[in-house]
């Protein structure tokens, strides 16, 4: 089984937040001669973190799914993901499945508020059929019990798994399972960024994916709930008989915006996931419901995400909000406006010296085999950060950030797994 980077379109989307700036307040590059240790914050007394005894999820109001697979035929497994390695060498198996069901969309009688305390109700339903990609230990004895379910990112016009790409080394060390979910319409049907459209599932491989059907992003929140419930309830079918004890939902960048709205709108009642990683979000919340892509400002049925959205404080599941420095202080994402205090169920990690996209995620990680070569490549970049990557397709003019994003994210995933 080969897990490989298929092409480089997604890097163009994040390239602008990867280059260093002349403004020292927002410059997150690692200067020549700096080390990873040089990015660490001064030691201070941290708040006590509650470690919870595992509490079974309730899975309330979530529709049942039908599972097909493992899927064969065609080329398959169209997803951009860092790392070229033979999974069998790590004792891992990669399989793909289709899940289908009937999903709800959601609406709210009131505008969605900054505090995240949203009250939503189901609006309408639609049938769907999408795909999930599973990377799991081949042998049950090697399984940690934890499953990470990633809301695949479609900013580049196709499915990508950026959190997997930056943290797969830690997941494999744990012996955990990763499940990537084609949650949004663009990854299945197209219609997004034109750069990636030729790798959309149904366009790139109609033989394999032609029967898929995604009714639109209004239904994505319920699809993500149903995918998580499938991991719990049909593990024999999709995990090769592995039995999960913890299922963590995660999403990065654009998917983190949607994870924010998922947490505020759907998570409290569905209670599917044991905990959540919100990775590199901005200040906004994603739209909850759009009649026509929220293009008509006068459409009363639209329920748009607020300009600033905190994560609601009454959640009873741990949430780790992970932010690179450019997520917080950069002009593109502006998470600083949505910062909120830590609580028993919320932790915010803001990682100095890191960028939304960096030298590891934009190239070095593509050749990381887990043998240490990726580490050496990143350490070398810290002493001489590149100003261009991918044969000059991204040209920054200034050094591309070579900070420790991947390492701190791996630590975050390890800590979240212990926390829940």
Model-identified regions with their sequence ranges:
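Active-site machinery of serine-nucleophile hydrolases
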Residues: 82, 88-90, 94-105, 125, ...
